[in-house]
Amino acid sequence: MKNSIIFLLSLLYIQTFAQVKSSDTQTIIEKEKNAFVQKMNVGNINPNTLNYDLRYQRMDLTVNPSVYHVSGSVTSHFIPNQSISSIYFDLTPQLTVSQVSYHGNSLNFQQLPSNEVKVDFTAALPSSTLDSLTIHYSGAPAVGYNAFSVDTQNSTAILSTLSEPYGAQDWFPTKQSLNDKIERFDIKITAPAQYNVASNGTLMSETLLPGSQKLTFWRTQYPMAAYLAAIAITNYTKLNDVIGSPPFPFVNYIYPSTAADPAAMANIEWTKQAMTTFETYFGAYPFRNEKYGHMQFQFGGGMEHQTMSSMGGFTKQLIAHELAHQWFGDKVTCGAWNDIWLNEGFATFGEHLVNEKLIMTNTQFMNYLIGQKNFITSSPGGSVYVADANLASVNTIFNGRLSYAKGG
């Protein structure tokens, strides 16, 4: 009888554990699905941006987490791959361009209803020659897409961005191509001095300005797809630590309430174990010269912004999923959204890996895998590749059975 009770309790534990894991996975999927669904009217590639290579961008923006507005400029360095007399950038019309500067002069431009800015040069630019221009703009970004959001956390204002897949154009002019990563990105944000600004790469400086403002300068020198650029701003507690072997910076910008939560802090510390495991099996963390870390934001789930994941919470599964994306999704990025299983499948595999090595017993893990297999085979057919005809179906792209479970 005693053994029977223990066996039944074990089954109950495994079932409960599996339900928790399933709930966590569904939260991750719903986050990514909701981010994508608002922007499905855009295709994989804007053909008007294929005639140049975007090499560098510098954003100089002024924002306030209490105000739904952005103003400033973005400087872009590019190399035409053919002679061009005009250049296009992705930018939604809710943002108003006031000027395009080019070597001290102003250029003519048009804002098009196709979410583009067309800039006309006074003379054709030659192929294979580095050039640059600056777009000055301002406005209230498109509402409802979560690409640019202001809200509150614990009664304090917070601003965050979440650009996957096509939301970068909602808050800055860029080239939204998965095949043309931006080699270097400088992110300069002016905001009220009481807030801390989190972003990609290395923190270069924080400078107090007149009028109780602060300029925060982040720089990343690793190639990055436009949708992986992000900022988040609130009264963060900043935690500077190290991770990995040999160690590199582990930087967390979290709410003060999270810093006072022992369970959340223990899981953030657990990230170090996940990093060691992933480096053992995936190879060196791909952005070691800068950092890894988390910036907390007001949405459920998370987002694998390069070098600094945005996190709605700190469960171990979510931490592992977003960390695995740094290898698969950020360093190695699918060339088209048809192949999103390459991002999500490998991130799901990362969850499996920490379940096996760090979280579960052998029995728990085998039962977990059986559950995954049963889920994958619960319906007939299904390809991890999303055909062009299904790119308008967010439920097909973010299919938990195929893109996540079967992909993993």
Per-segment meaning from a language model:
Residues 1-26:
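Bacterial Sec-dependent N-terminal signal peptides
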Residues 18-71, 153, 157-160:
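N-terminal, polar/Ser/Thr-rich
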Residues 20-21, 28, 87, 92-154:
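A surface-exposed beta-strand-loop module
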Residues 47, 136-185:
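Glycine/proline-rich low-complexity spacer/linker segments in large multi-domain proteins
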Residues 67-93:
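Ligand-binding face of N-terminal immunoglobulin V-set domains in extracellular IgSF glycoproteins
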Residues 72, 163-164, 176-320, 349:
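Hydrophobic helix-coil surface modules that form long, contiguous segments used
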Residues 308-370:
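Zinc-dependent metallopeptidase catalytic helix centered on the HExxH motif
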Residues 344, 348-408:
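Acidic/His/Gly-enriched intrinsically disordered linker/tail segments
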